Amino acid sequence: MYKRQSINLVAASFCEAFMAEGDEVIVSVMEHHSNIVPWQLQAAKRGIALKVIPMDDSGKLDMQAYEQLFSERTKIVSVAHVSNTLGTVNPVKEIVRIAHEHGVPVLVDGAQSTPHFAIDVQSIDCDFFAFSGHKIYGPTGIGVLYGKEEWLDRMPPYQGGGEMIESVSFEKTTFEKLPFKFEAGTPDYVATHGLATALNYVSALGMDNIAAHERELTDYCMKRLAEIDGMRLFGTTEGKDAVVSFLVGDIHHLDMGTLLDRLGIAVRTGHHCAQPVMDRFGIQGMVRASFGLYNTKEEVDALV
């Protein structure tokens, strides 16, 4: 179950069980589309509302504004652990603490954090946590959804099919216990083995070692790029992680990406499935360099 499907599962099943017309979901302005669109689909179907946490020019969430978004109709918070466009590491423990003070559960989108540093869902105390396999060197089309039993037990199945049933008749179907009631059909056991291999690989390297290496590369890249005339860097919060996004002068982001590609440098251009972030900064797209455990300072120098 990859991250997008995981968030769709939570959105559909949680809303079915716990939300009614007029209820509210809190998300942030820096969300990937996969943590916006599923909630919008539910909003259109059920008449619920999305409230959005704003951010400042550095890419830091406005936590005071976040606290003020809660009302008696707020039912769930769904936020990115790390922004895929800005590299901002959001204070998810604080986000969860505030939400829990209001009796509201939290889903954390960990797709951009899980490959880059160690995650402890019990320490974060989030109610749901989702990440993708391909971001952590595993296969595409698979990922993980963690959820607390107290919520998952009360949520109805998201999809129907074989394997997730206890018994079936034309009068009534009963469902298996967790996690099987959410796993309809034959699982992709090949991808499961691939993801397990990837997780064992990064665990053997040590997530703290990976984090230290990538943070060093990120800081070095930010400093080097800042020396270039006309450089505009996006996401300048302290402690940002493994993502450097930028524009240079009046050069279109697609042109910059094409030029770098001809030099053998792989970057991504466009809105990065985060159009509200582009709107926040008044741009159509940006160039994004992202770092993995295999990158080096020499490659940063080649980019610069």
Where are the regions a protein language model picked out?
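Pyridoxal 5′-phosphate
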Residues: 3-304
